[in-house]
Amino acid sequence: MALWGGRFTQAADQRFKQFNDSLRFDYRLAEQDIVGSVAWSKALVTVGVLTAEEQAQLEEALSVLLEDVRARPQQILESDAEDIHSWVEGKLIDKVGQLGKKLHTGRSRNDQVATDLKLWCKDTVSELLTANRQLQSALVETAQNNQDAVMPGYTHLQRAQPVTFAHWCLAYVEMLARDESRLQDALKRLDVSPLGCGALAGTAYEIDREQLAGWLGFASATRNSLDSVSDRDHVLELLSAAAIGMVHLSRFAEDLIFFNTGEAGFVELSDRVTSGSSLMPQKKNPDALELIRGKCGRVQGALTGMMMTLKGLPLAYNKDMQEDKEGLFDALDTWLDCLHMAALVLDGIQVKRPRCQEAAQQGYANATELADYLVAKGVPFREAHHIVGEAVVEAIRQGKPLEDLPLDELQKFSPVIGEDVYPILSLQSCLDKRAAKGGVSPQQVAQAIAFAQARLG
């Protein structure tokens, strides 16, 4: 059933109809469309378009339809309706007859779809926030269980300074906390109702839009009808949050892919999140993590695509805006799936402490400690930096770690070096000295874990 047609003397070409129809993807707004229609029916009572009895009849029919949709959503795609709005209205008319044709009074598909999409976004943000916090909790739990797992930290993929696996986990907790904050901020801005703005100029009926917004669970109603029907900032904001969030998950995946290699050997992934090779029997591939990393690109593409769709649109509504949904649906679905999958990866991960410790003791990760030791003895840092660089070259030449160089050899580089240098060069000392807020010392890591646990509840 088309919601328009009186103006036309020819039927739409079937090829155009298929090109124009959006039911194949906006069917996902069915529940929101029905909920919005119930609220609109109540508003029509307040302006005398519907009687209380008519509204009750419509609400009952819409409630039955809502249950039908939840029980068998695939029925929607069996229809040739243009979009979800015409499908819902057609089903309503089937149930209540001519009364169903009164429901659209004073309403446009422009404010209707804007409302539906915002309601869907609110529901989906709630799911994303839950999944985000679940992953944060999984990371905090993994950190708590691995506070003593010393491993190399990297810059430029070169061993830099010793850290702990717990500290690594907590770095991603911080990223996810920012993602959570971005979602909460976006939610505040999208929590305004456009329903009652009509096609672009507002509705001709004196409907209390603030009351209507409250019925739908919005914090308030929008203030400008022209902006309301053409606003898709909430789509851009959520796509941006998803793009940033997926970058974080991609980096998380890349780190663990590297940690899982035979060359690093810091972790072993569970069989539940890995796959084998059709040719090589020995293979255990980190497919879950590789897919998280790979799916990042499609989310970035959705954001870029939506930016380009909106950049040249005049006010108010244009059919281009139909392109807002597929990318948004896919991007947020992808982000949600990847959050769940990242948590599943952590659920069965094994941290190989001996190998982590061995790697942390290699690569002269304690060189900075020797420089700090010299500074404490009164040597200017730049000079100390140069001295330690020369000492590292000699240690490499001899194939020894710094702490295995005899004192007389170390003193060739600086006479201020004494026997007290050796405890300073231990891995534990390297960690203990990073005791400022945010550092890798056991005390700071324990405090960070406690803070995250309290925040997450």
UniProtKB/Swiss-Prot annotation:
PROSITE patterns: FUMARATE_LYASES
Source organism superkingdom: Bacteria
EC numbers for this chain: 4.3.2.1
InterPro entries documented for this protein: Arg_succ_lyase_C, Argininosuccinate_lyase, Fumarase/histidase_N, Fumarate_lyase_CS, Fumarate_lyase_fam, Fumarate_lyase_N, L-Aspartase-like
Catalytic function, reaction form: 2-(N(omega)-L-arginino)succinate = fumarate + L-arginine
Keyword set includes Plastid: no
Molecular function terms from GO: argininosuccinate lyase activity
GO biological process: arginine biosynthetic process via ornithine; L-arginine biosynthetic process
Pfam families: ASL_C2, Lyase_1
Alphabetically ordered keywords of this record: Amino-acid biosynthesis, Arginine biosynthesis, Cytoplasm, Lyase
One GO cellular component, as annotated: cytosol
Pathway annotation from the record: Amino-acid biosynthesis; L-arginine biosynthesis; L-arginine from L-ornithine and carbamoyl phosphate: step 3/3
Gene3D superfamilies membership: Fumarase/aspartase (C-terminal domain), Fumarase/aspartase (Central domain), Fumarase/aspartase (N-terminal domain)
EC primary class: lyase
Subcellular location: Cytoplasm
Key word Cell inner membrane present: no
Signal sequence coordinates: none
Membership in a protein family: Belongs to the lyase 1 family. Argininosuccinate lyase subfamily.
Record-linked NCBIfam families: argH (TIGR00838), PRK12308.1 (NF008964)
HAMAP family: Arg_succ_lyase
PANTHER family: ARGININOSUCCINATE LYASE
Protein known as: Argininosuccinate lyase
Species the sequence originates in: Shigella sonnei (strain Ss046)
